Amino acid sequence: VALDRNGNGLPDDEWYELAGSEYHKPETAHNYTITYYRTPADHVATPIPQTPITDTSYIAWIANDGSTGYIEKNSYHRQEYFPQWIDSDEITFSGTRLAHNAIDESGIGSYYVLYAYDWGYADNHPNEVEDKSCFNIDWAVDQDGNPVHLDGADFIRVFTGVNQSCGWLGETSTELCRAEDLHIELSTIPNP
């Protein structure tokens, strides 16, 4: 979240993270950066026969922790995966990366379960689970993890906090259709 401290109506002031249940856990990676690369025009797909995966090497990525990989393309999502509205052949995101929460319960790649984090993350619990699917700006921390007091938030940014693939389901991604300002005065959600 960010406050428009300079009053120019642009999200160019300091951003603060809302520290959810995983923020202080040792397996959480802070200051994580990942760069995705546009698939070259002459790319030859590498499918896995008799599966929904149509290209195992579709979009290359590299992270600042030294890990590398590919976003696989599957037959359920035929659109381009790389943003077509940018001119650059690479796009970089930075933030906090949570530990994987997807388990292949079948052991053969046919049944993935994404187990919910306890609280404080979008697209994580059903909406009716109010204490776990809402946010509180009292959880705001600065880039060093120090709590900060905010009187409000003018800008809100939501991003996918994991880097994991679930086989035929594809890459785990946050899907959000709306947000609502509830101005909750009392909360049973614990502060980190």
Predicted segment positions?
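Ser/Thr/Pro-rich, low-complexity mucin-like regions
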Residues: 125-190
